[in-house]
């Protein structure tokens, strides 16, 4: 997400707020895939990694409903890519991290003794998924932290 905050409160945020999250978290990746999928098919080993979120996998906070729903949509997109591209060697994976130290989470305080994951941990996870052979396909990788209940 390139936004600077989580959002989409069930009872408080506007419909425009929800639209913005779907524009960034679902429609943006959809447009990129539509542009690149034909070339990825030609390679026979194309790879697509969507960074989703545990919030899209297991939403627990109604204050970030829009964020969670848009990330769930991104996960659905990844599943559609994986099925559509399978016979042409295209593999797609959703990486679903928990709380990561980013600009978006800067304002979120965590309980004593807890910590946010570093972005490098997610980068390593993505790198791993990209190196798998075509015979090994991973639909999703959940990267939990002890802060999962905050999502």
Stretches with model-predicted labels:
Residues 1-2:
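Short, small-residue-biased leader/transition segments that mark boundaries at the very start
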Residues 9-10, 14-22:
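Substrate-binding pocket helix/loop in short-chain dehydrogenase/reductase
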Residues 13, 59-68, 80, 109:
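Active-site loop-to-helix junction immediately N-terminal to the catalytic Tyr of the SDR YXXXK motif
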Residues 33, 70:
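Active-site helix of classical SDR
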Residues 53:
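Residue(s) in the substrate-gating loop at a strand-loop-helix junction
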Residues 58-59, 80-90:
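Active-site-adjacent segment of SDR/Rossmann-fold oxidoreductases
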Residues 87-90, 94, 111-151:
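C-terminal helical subdomain
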